[in-house]
């Protein structure tokens, strides 16, 4: 077993060796530009790009013509949310989303608010899931877009997307789904789930970083305004020379996910449960955040009461985990996702996200259980609050003295 141990699979995944092998020729011998139509180098590159497009489409039950290559899921989210809002704004300027979305969606929504759009930010239930009835109640005659993720990047909680998609479809509203954390881990089908736009990332499913895709429905056709102008690549949706090696890698990653996903999900879920039960045996006052029933296989988001998450992360340097999402864990604010779910500020501050995946082992899980057990106990020994709770004191009943 190699130290440090990687348990942050929601932030990124290692590139699968089979993916790397598929990519290598496109750096060295097959280096053509896929847009070069006049010679064999370009044709070879285009052929590889189209084969990868087929694989990504197959993974989500779409047609290859509905896959648009991007530089990653942040760009896909921006193109979907802003592109749809700008195209349909004559019909209305009201958008609906959830407070626990990824920052790429939330910040796109805030940018649109500054342009005069009105956004309804819905609160999830205590278990992290969004109630479809709330979406239905939020729709208005001028609503043009609903954007709800499939699986949350912090809690791994899976929303009832098919139901939300059906509500949007019946109301004639475009439905965007950020499916970055679910595609390749659990089934995702654009037809069964009534999805019009879906964001996909390669590096969250053992592909390379810096490449992603946006699914754009053709029947009934969904229209977007391009957010990037240039040579009109990708049917005008997204100009820019295609990253051929990255796209080939994403195609291979999609193929492997399609073939191995179900068996992998069983193995990774077993590892997650081993981790959860092990931590629960080692420690008291431990809270799992979000629904365990509706959750992606490798996610465990846990709050260790009376321990500061950042202090714990420093104490367990041998295990790579995160507090909050990788995109925002640089800020010391407690997780906005957990706060929106109604988790107290103290518990949100003490939360750790474990992400297990394809290359995680039982040995690594057992090591993490021992290490976290030891370090949490040590940090709690220094916490007067923990001592008081153990002595049966109800902290809510205490009148704290004002320090001023």
Curated annotation (Swiss-Prot):
InterPro entries: Aminotrans_V_dom, Aminotrans_V_PyrdxlP_BS, Cys_deSase_IscS, Cysteine_dSase, PyrdxlP-dep_Trfase, PyrdxlP-dep_Trfase_major, PyrdxlP-dep_Trfase_small. The modification N6-(pyridoxal phosphate)lysine is found at residue 204. [2Fe-2S] cluster binds at residue 327. Keywords: 2Fe-2S, Cytoplasm, Iron, Iron-sulfur, Metal-binding, Pyridoxal phosphate, Transferase. It is an enzyme of class 2 (transferase). It catalyses: (sulfur carrier)-H + L-cysteine = (sulfur carrier)-SH + L-alanine. The active site is at residue 327. One of its GO terms (biological process) is [2Fe-2S] cluster assembly. Its main location: cytoplasm. Pfam families: Aminotran_5. The keyword Iron-sulfur applies. PROSITE patterns: AA_TRANSFER_CLASS_5. The keyword Cytoplasm applies. One of its GO terms (cellular component) is L-cysteine desulfurase complex. Its EC number is 2.8.1.7. It is found in: Cytoplasm. Pathway: Cofactor biosynthesis; iron-sulfur cluster biosynthesis. Pyridoxal 5'-phosphate binds at residues 73-74, 153, 181, 201-203, 241. SUPFAM superfamilies: PLP-dependent transferases. HAMAP family: Cys_desulf_IscS (MF_00331). NCBIfam families: IscS, PRK02948.1, PRK14012.1. Master enzyme that delivers sulfur to a number of partners involved in Fe-S cluster assembly, tRNA modification or cofactor biosynthesis. Catalyzes the removal of elemental sulfur atoms from cysteine to produce alanine. Functions as a sulfur delivery protein for Fe-S cluster synthesis onto IscU, an Fe-S scaffold assembly protein, as well as other S acceptor proteins. This is Cysteine desulfurase IscS. It comes from Anaeromyxobacter dehalogenans (strain 2CP-C). The gene is iscS.
